[in-house]
């Protein structure tokens, strides 16, 4: 469960390394977001010379959380870190590579391009 002011690692090569959540999209009083949800973030740290700069406000989709996610068949899946992928306004990823595994719920949430770039979909 990701809430306002949570820090997430960036799982793509857009240039940002870490982001902080400013807002959870999807409701006026929404407190938490999970895998597949869109969030608005501020970049905490970025690689030098990248297009994405520190302090820039960006949109991202959550791809990994440390909180377990219950699936329809009763199984649970959780990851060792919280991570997000930066996206453009048309829900396509800003980077050209995705690092680490992602949950298959990302594809079901309408982010098929992110799922196709990922090295492993769990």
Swiss-Prot record:
GO terms for molecular function: large ribosomal subunit rRNA binding; structural constituent of ribosome. Pfam families: Ribosomal_L14. CDD domains: Ribosomal_uL14. Keywords: Ribonucleoprotein, Ribosomal protein, RNA-binding, rRNA-binding. GO terms for cellular component: cytosolic large ribosomal subunit. PROSITE patterns: RIBOSOMAL_L14 (PS00049). GO terms for biological process: translation. Gene3D superfamilies: Ribosomal protein L14. SMART domains: Ribosomal_L14. It comes from the Bacteria. Part of the 50S ribosomal subunit. Forms a cluster with proteins L3 and L19. In the 70S ribosome, L14 and L19 interact and together make contacts with the 16S rRNA in bridges B5 and B8. NCBIfam families: rplN_bact. Belongs to the universal ribosomal protein uL14 family. Binds to 23S rRNA. Forms part of two intersubunit bridges in the 70S ribosome. This is Large ribosomal subunit protein uL14.
């Amino acid at each position: 469960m990701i809430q306002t002011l949570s820090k997430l690692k960036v799982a793509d090569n857009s240039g940002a390394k870490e982001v902080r959540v400013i807002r959870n999209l999807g409701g006026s009083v929404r407190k938490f977001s999970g895998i597949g949800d869109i969030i608005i973030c501020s970049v905490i740290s970025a690689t030098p010379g990248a297009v994405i700069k520190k302090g820039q406000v960006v949109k991202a989709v959550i791809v990994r959380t440390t909180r377990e996610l219950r699936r329809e068949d009763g199984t649970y899946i959780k990851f060792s870190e919280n991570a997000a992928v930066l996206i453009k306004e048309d829900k396509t990823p800003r980077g050209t590579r995705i690092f680490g595994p992602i949950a298959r719920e990302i594809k079901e949430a309408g982010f098929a391009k992110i799922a196709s770039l990922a090295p492993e979909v769990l």
